[in-house]
Amino acid sequence: MFAHSICAGGPLPWPDLPFRWDRSGTHQEVVVFTDTSLVEAVGRSDCFKVAWMLESPRATRREYRWLWRNASAFDRVLTFEQGLLEALPHAKFCPLGGCWIAPEDWKVHQKTRNLSVIASAKRDMPGQKLRHEVIRRHSSAIDAILGRGYREIAGKIEGLGDYRYSLAIENCRQNYYFSEKLIDCLLTGTVPIYWGCPSIGLFFDKEGIIAFEHPRDLGLVLEQIGPEDYERRLPAIQRNLDLAKRYVYPEAHVWESIRDLF
């Protein structure tokens, strides 16, 4: 799933963890099978088999259906999907999170601009479509419309560091599912105007997040944001920055969930 990078959650250096991924296939005590490689576990009896579901069910419907039918093929299932967690005794909660912000930029930056959005050109998932709809409806209220779908930037810090707020829209809306789209905002002291995980209050201070469900809800929100609102939220912004550091590396949660297998 993430052979193009060292870490599953983004282009960061490897964290201080007592393991590294080995893709050579020569070490087989514990083997982790991600979404699209689950079927490779069938017939294997030479290792502990771990299923790690990285994508949401909206993105990998076929893989989730297969796992529901074949969950017993694995010694452990790592997932954020609520149904699997409730149904499978060998399932463990493993949040996605992730981060595309360099560690030296994890701080509350001096904010000089109000609102940004970063969007690719993709329009497949519900949240991807919603990003473009929000931009179409509310472009006059957005200071910077960035990303490969609009104006490409060298790094996400360019679209977050200077901004009090940023529209952070997940690819889908699902309990326990949140990604770097949220984490990157929190790590830069930027208040996410957020569409995504309905249960986000279980993980972060909701005073530092402005959640919405439909583009029509945004008009009033965008009228009320600004320096005074941001200053009022600063204690929650700092709390969320500290909390977000727990979710930078998905591998940290993987390790906590499988360390007993070694």
Q: What do these predicted regions represent?
A:
Residues 1-53, 58-144, 149, 156-166, ...:
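Pol beta-like nucleotidyltransferase catalytic core
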